[in-house]
Amino acid sequence: MMAKKPPKPAPRRIFQERLKITALPLYFEGFLLIKRSGYREYEHYWTELRGTTLFFYTDKKSIIYVDKLDIVDLTCLTEQNSTEKNCAKFTLVLPKEEVQLKTENTESGEEWRGFILTVTELSVPQNVSLLPGQVIKLHEVLEREKKRRIETEQSTSVEKEKEPTEDYVDVLNPMPACFYTVSRKEATEMLQKNPSLGNMILRPGSDSRNYSITIRQEIDIPRIKHYKVMSVGQNYTIELEKPVTLPNLFSVIDYFVKETRGNLRPFICSTDENTGQEPSMEGRSEKLKKNPHIA
């Protein structure tokens, strides 16, 4: 019986976009069945091992991952006896949870086990049944991971020594001035009623983690558009035909301004005269109602 062919890697464009989002080297990839704490059943994901993190995608072509698992603090990897034919099952024991993995065949199970142990223990395991070429690849990954960790430590040390001048902006202004805790409908109404204040609003997304940009364009007739801004690790990705990943929300706003050559302007209410601070949402709404043309 012929062995199953290894899964084909994702197309180059997808690979490059994922690399920009994760900022980690790809060591191994393939389909995995995952059962995390709280899962009732196994869920099927295209999985990438990048550095010491597993990234889970709904399918092979998805650019943005739906979940990730940091395995750098892996306590142990335990194999499970599977009643299913030609299937490998094992558990990743982590400090805060245990994650069950299942592969479509025993061959890929050995590969996953080998790569996971190599990057977490920083040594090639001796008790894996792999071909010579696969073992060579494990040694290559080991050297890459050692080098990556050294470079990461050096980079972290250099950053700590630098004066954090750029961080002062974030401390004083944790969110861009055009951020409002409003719904999609409320953002639309604010832009329509007060065009002199700007034509772009940053607001919370449909969940508590991500964001959305609402804009009002006047090309032929006024049009309202909405863009999703996904929080991905420490970065933010604007969901466009070609996704754009930026380091913070201030950069997201700047991107829209620059790409439209200033046609898009952040929607900004005036500050309270007495305190010099942004008014509350109720205060903003009340001021807008009383004077729709505040500067």
UniProtKB/Swiss-Prot annotation:
Keyword Phosphoprotein set for record: yes
Disulfide links within the chain: none
Family matches, as SUPFAM superfamilies: PH domain-like, SH2 domain
The keyword Cytoplasm belongs to this UniProt entry's keyword annotation: yes
Residue intervals of the PH domain: 25-121
Cited CDD domains: PH_Brdg1 (cd13268), SH2_STAP1 (cd10403)
UniProt GO cellular component terms: cytoplasm; cytosol; mitochondrion; nuclear body; nucleus; protein-containing complex
GO MF annotations in UniProt: macrophage colony-stimulating factor receptor binding; phospholipid binding; phosphotyrosine residue binding; protein kinase binding; protein tyrosine kinase activator activity; signaling adaptor activity; transmembrane receptor protein tyrosine kinase adaptor activity
Subcellular location: Nucleus; Cytoplasm; Mitochondrion
Annotated stretches, region: Disordered: 270-295
Oligomeric form and interacting partners: Interacts with KIT and CSF1R. Interacts with URI1; the interaction is phosphorylation-dependent and occurs in a growth-dependent manner.
Protein name: Signal-transducing adaptor protein 1
Biological source species: Homo sapiens (Human)
